[in-house]
Amino acid sequence: MAKPTVVLLPVWGAGHFMPMIEAGKRLLRGSGGALSVTVLLMPAPTPDAAVDIAAQVKREEASGADDISFRHLPAVDMPTGHTGVEEWISRILRSHAPNVRAAIAGLDCPVAALVTDIFCTPALEVSRELGVPGYVYFPCSASMLALLLRSPGLDEEVAVEFEEMDGAIRIPGLPPVPPSALPSTMLDRKKSTYDWFVATGRGYMNATGFIVNTAAELEQSVIDAIADGRCTRGVPAPTVYPIGPVLYFPPPPEEQPHECVRWLDAQPPASVLFLCFGSKGLLPPPKVREIAAALGRSGGHRFLWVLRGPPKDSRHGQRVPTDAMLDELLPEGFLERTKGRGLVWPTRAPQKEILAHAAVGGFVTHCGWNSILESLWFGVPVLPWPLDAEQHFNAFTLVAHLGVAVPLGMDRRRDNFVEAAELERAVRSLMDDASEEGRKARAKAAETRVVCRKAVEEGGSSSTAFRRLTDDIVRRGAVQIR
């Protein structure tokens, strides 16, 4: 008889696809050969995303893993009439629900579980219809999960726009949250994206469990609050399995090290500020000018700045940066004035290799959770510059909850604008040896490096949670779908 399979339904995107695949591979290893993994592939919405996914699938298939297979779902029409990318992705997934149902029904082996992405609540309805346990793979923080679960209650309890509230918002397990730190999806309750957010939090209660890319030691108070029902008004929430950090480390290149890494090799330890705003992080010219001004007068601190150009197509889901034309984007003479202590890189850069380098002493990040986990894994303190989605909430937790960041003042109403003087102050605070604020962030980042690595070791908290997840899936049994 064929092995029971765990079906994965990932979405495209750097912080979504490979972490879920890595979690699936760990599930295989943890099952001791009792399970297989089937990955359902939705067509990516952009050519660049399709190329990335195809390359990653090819790598996995070439690795020779017998118990992991990939199945392509047919294309669906792209939705229209949405107010945000999160809602857009979720509507794509709702269109795929019949395809997911048909693909699972067509498997020739029993199905032990369906694991969906954060956006895939429609797939939880499919799992319930088929009688299969449905898990949400949550590639964000447990704090963000707590906010989502709390959102239906907040929607009923708060009568005004959250930004008009007096005082802070209470999320069990977290310090008081200022309304300015809420995700962009919560800031306009008249938009359908807000309705999507609240409906997602409500729909999550139909899950069997949450597989969260975090370590218990990083967010224990939040995980406890979810488990106690404090985020869901006393109703027991699905089980949380904190199994992170789950990070994808590609095979090392056979050729010589990347040019950015070679440049770092020539810099003193912990002397370089690394600036990178994610795979879709785009900075308009006014922000570029402020960063250049701050770096030009930030006390001579070294820097490595990944600066991308504007996208060719800015429709939802297609904001893919291009290679930057540095002479057009940067102030005249900037490269010459900073030559020797700074490198501006105009295309993709190997972020993990850079964060792992001993020369890097600080990280200006857009606060995507995957980038945060990488900085925690390598013990690099942070200057948070959130741009969109849940990133402002992540920035808040980095400063107020985890303590690994120096706060950066910004004007969210001006598209998250940061004045050069404020960025210069924050850079000095993070990087100067004499800064008490920076010293605390550096010390806390060094602690989290140890915590993250111990968590995934044999017997660590994340390793134990993964074993518990595997045992629970096997114990529940598998269903032969007809």
UniProtKB/Swiss-Prot annotation:
Does this UniProt record's set of keywords contain Endoplasmic reticulum? yes
Chief place where the protein resides: endoplasmic reticulum
**What GO biological process, any one, is recorded here?**
anthocyanin-containing compound biosynthetic process
Annotated UDP binding lies at S279, W345, A349, H366, N370, S371, E374
Which EC numbers characterise this protein's activity in its record?
Answer: 2.4.1.-
Chemical reaction(s) catalysed: malvidin + UDP-alpha-D-galactose = malvidin 3-O-beta-D-galactoside + UDP + H(+)
Q: Which keywords appear in this protein's UniProt record, sorted alphabetically?
A: Endoplasmic reticulum, Nucleus, Transferase
| Protein's name in the database | Malvidin galactosylase UGT88C3
Biological function: UDP-glycosyltransferase which uses UDP-galactose and malvidin as substrates to catalyze the biosynthesis of malvidin 3-O-galactoside, an anthocyanin conferring purple pigmentation.
Whether Nucleus counts among this entry's keywords is: yes
Record pathway: Pigment biosynthesis; anthocyanin biosynthesis
InterPro entries (UniProt xref): UDP-glycosyltransf_plant, UDP_glucos_trans
> What is stated as this protein's family in its record?
Belongs to the UDP-glycosyltransferase family.
**Superkingdom of this protein's organism:** Eukaryota
Q: Which Gene3D superfamilies match?
A: Glycogen Phosphorylase B
EC top class named in words? transferase
Question: Among the entry's GO cellular component annotations, what is one?
Answer: nucleus
Location in the cell: Endoplasmic reticulum; Nucleus
Citing just one GO molecular function, the answer is: UDP-glycosyltransferase activity
Q: Which Pfam family, just one, is annotated for this protein?
A: UDPGT
Task: Give the active-site positions.
Answer: H16, D117
PANTHER family from the UniProt entry: GLYCOSYLTRANSFERASE (PTHR48048), OS07G0510400 PROTEIN (PTHR48048:SF65)
